[in-house]
From Swiss-Prot:
It holds the Pfam family Semialdhyde_dhC. It comes from Leptospira interrogans serogroup Icterohaemorrhagiae serovar copenhageni (strain Fiocruz L1-130). It catalyses: L-aspartate 4-semialdehyde + phosphate + NADP(+) = 4-phospho-L-aspartate + NADPH + H(+). This is Aspartate-semialdehyde dehydrogenase. GO terms for molecular function: aspartate-semialdehyde dehydrogenase activity; NAD binding; NADP binding; protein dimerization activity. Pathway: Amino-acid biosynthesis; L-lysine biosynthesis via DAP pathway; (S)-tetrahydrodipicolinate from L-aspartate: step 2/4; Amino-acid biosynthesis; L-methionine biosynthesis via de novo pathway; L-homoserine from L-aspartate: step 2/3; Amino-acid biosynthesis; L-threonine biosynthesis; L-threonine from L-aspartate: step 2/5. Belongs to the aspartate-semialdehyde dehydrogenase family. The lineage of its organism: Bacteria, Pseudomonadati, Spirochaetota, Spirochaetia, Leptospirales.
Length: 349
């Protein structure tokens, strides 16, 4: 069976590199076009990335000889789908151009997330939101990932919301430096330090989970009806976003009921047996000092959400710690899992 031809936009960036790694020998998709800025256009990917490849494994052989082009749908007419790791400064217009040209977009940028006809898709959490795609007026459809920080948070909240209802959430993030892209945060700012502000992150952390966990009515996504308060911090960890979460419930669960809801949680990717679907979706660890990025980040090849330290909260009801891989589960891996879901559900033709 022939594979679907795809492009990667922003192929030289940190998320673009993850796409290229994860799509190596993928059973559904074949990268035929790599797109980046004019500075890289006309050169082979291997030439451009000699000193810029920042993943521990080598550049996949298939990508080295692909010639980079600028992100223009006229230059990628044969692709069905484009994975976008573009910076938000340019992503909005470029992604819209691809959709207008009939090429589907799965985006990691913030630009289209708040459009009520664009799903912020987390494949296990809200696959039903795909039905709003019919409300988009373009031939190509736009789907977005959430902000990488709240990907694991949203996954952790979904089974709790379904079983017990949620009134409010407080979260405190410790976000890895890779989340800022490359070259990222200056060394003298982050070494031996914590930066208690990341521009725009708290606003995204307080609103995006509500859309992810909302419901579809009349072709639009309505937000979930609870409130979130967020503190977002940059810490000197390379990969892995750790978030401390406190939750107030409508129906008061026991510790055992919460853990059971996490252990039982799965979604359509697991039912369909998608290649990148983690099993388990959530791993709960009983050790009092877990999860840790150094020890738990690669669980499920970076796709499993790891939770620990569940205990009573004297102000709300319960609190816990959640860890997810920000460039895999929170970015390229989530986008690829979304694409696998689209493929299996025949959205790609």
């Amino acid at each position: 069976m022939s594979r679907v031809k795809v492009a990667v936009l922003g192929a030289t960036g940190s998320v673009g590199q993850r796409f290229i790694q994860l799509l190596d020998h993928h059973p559904f998709f074949e990268i035929t076009h790599l797109c980046a800025s004019e500075n890289s256009a006309g050169k082979t990917y291997g030439e451009v990335m000699k000193t810029r490849w920042k993943i521990s494994s080598d550049i996949p052989a298939y990508a080295k000889n692909l010639v980079i082009t600028t992100p223009d749908p006229a230059k990628t007419k044969d692709v069905v789908l484009a994975f976008s790791g573009l910076d938000s400064n340019v992503a909005g217009e470029v992604e819209k151009n691809y959709a207008n040209a009939g090429i589907h977009i799965i985006s990691n940028s913030k630009n289209h997330r708040m459009d009520p006809t664009v799903p912020i898709l987390s494949a296990e959490v809200n696959s039903s939101h795909l039905e709003v795609l019919t409300s988009q007026k373009t031939k190509g459809k736009i789907i977005t990932n959430s902000n990488c920080t709240i990907m694991g948070v949203t996954i952790s909240l979904k089974p709790l919301l379904d079983r017990f209802g949620i009134e409010s959430v407080m979260l405190f993030s410790m976000q890895a430096i890779s989340g800022a892209g490359y070259p990222g945060v200056p060394t003298m700012d982050i070494l031996g330090n914590v930066i208690p502000h990341i521009g725009g992150e708290e606003e995204k952390a307080e609103i995006e989970p509500l859309k992810c966990l909302g419901k579809v009515e009349n072709g639009k996504i309505l937000h979930a009806d609870f409130s979130i308060s967020a503190h977002c911090n940059r810490v000197p960890v390379f990969d892995g976003h750790t978030v401390c979460v406190s939750v107030k419930f409508k129906k008061k669960p026991s510790r055992e009921e919460i853990i059971s809801s996490w252990k039982d949680f799965s979604g359509e990717p697991q039912t369909l047996g998608l290649p990148l679907a983690p099993n388990p979706v959530i791993l709960f660890r009983e050790e009092e000092d877990r999860p840790q990025p150094r020890l738990d980040l690669d669980t499920g090849k970076g796709m499993t959400t790891v939770i620990g330290r569940l205990r009573p909260d004297p102000i709300l009801d319960w609190k816990y710690v959640v860890l997810s891989h920000n460039t895999i589960r929170g970015a390229a891996g989530a986008a690829l899992l979304n694409a696998e879901l689209l493929y299996k559900k025949k959205f790609l033709g």
